[in-house]
Amino acid sequence: MKKVYYIGDWVVQIGPVYAETSFNHAAKGLDFINYGHWLRDALQSTGEFAVTSVPTWDFYNMKPGEYENILATHHIVIFSDVEAKNFQLHPQFFNRHLFGTKVLTFPDRVKVTVNALKSGVNMMFLGGWLSFNGELGKGGWGRTPLREILPVECLEVEDLRESTEGFCAEAVEKKHPMLKGLDLATMPPVLGFNRVRPREGCPVIARWKNEGDPAIAVGQFGKGRALAYTSDPAPHWGCNFVFWKQYAKLWSNAARWLTAGGGR
């Protein structure tokens, strides 16, 4: 069984918040919600893949060597709504008790990620407000060396394209293994996506109908394969998508294609 490590698509919900007077209010509820359970379950549905799903704060808090071990022991790593700061910063940088006591540096997770993919680890880069360039540029992937392993090019401005009417996908490379047995015409509309540019040498497998922007693109970088899906595999953008009858098949196909490239 092949191993998948899925980072992102968790949230902490605080509330509801009640205000009894002008001076007193209280949050009366706290919940951890894994919006990634649809993708996790889809990938595990065929019995070919075992998925570990973690929130971004687990990734951010990893000790030196922990992330490297994950990359060494997994076939696919997924990033969804994981802004660049989670790669570039470390909690110890904000520990005031350490200021002025020793040199604070850690392995560069961006470089580690790029080198891992080129060495044979396969990766999915999935959309959201904090993916690609993201809301107000918060995603920031294109401003880091992650751009070397993205099968699309990020915009330099906010890239969110949203509509209450939704956007439908259409196939471009209809014979690509990722689309085997799928009919994208039956895929429900998504409520948003990240606008990106096609990258030379990286096939666009599907695009957003009437928009022309890539929906799915793939690439080979060294020994590893990369996939970009520019909408969200989870709500809210994907609140209709997750109930698509072929949702699990799409992601199973994607994982099979990633791991069939001669890498890990």
What are these regions (language model features)?
Residues 1-2, 9-19, 23, 36, ...:
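An acidic, glycine-rich "communication" segment
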Residues 1-12, 18-19, 69, 122, ...:
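Extracellular ligand-binding/catalytic regions of CAZymes and related secreted enzymes
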Residues 7-10, 56, 80-82, 126-129, ...:
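Active-site-proximal beta-strand/loop segments in catalytic clefts of secreted hydrolases
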Residues 24-140:
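Helical hinge/lid and interdomain linker segments adjacent to catalytic or ligand-binding clefts
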Residues 33-37, 144, 248-252:
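A structural signal for well-ordered alpha-helical segments within the folded catalytic domains
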Residues 53, 157-158, 263-264:
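Acidic/polar loop patches that form or flank catalytic/metal-binding clefts of enzymes
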Residues 65-66, 111-113, 192-193, 214-217:
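Generic recognition of flexible, low-complexity loop/linker segments
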Residues 78-81, 117-121, 150-154, 254, ...:
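Sec/Tat-exported extracytoplasmic proteins
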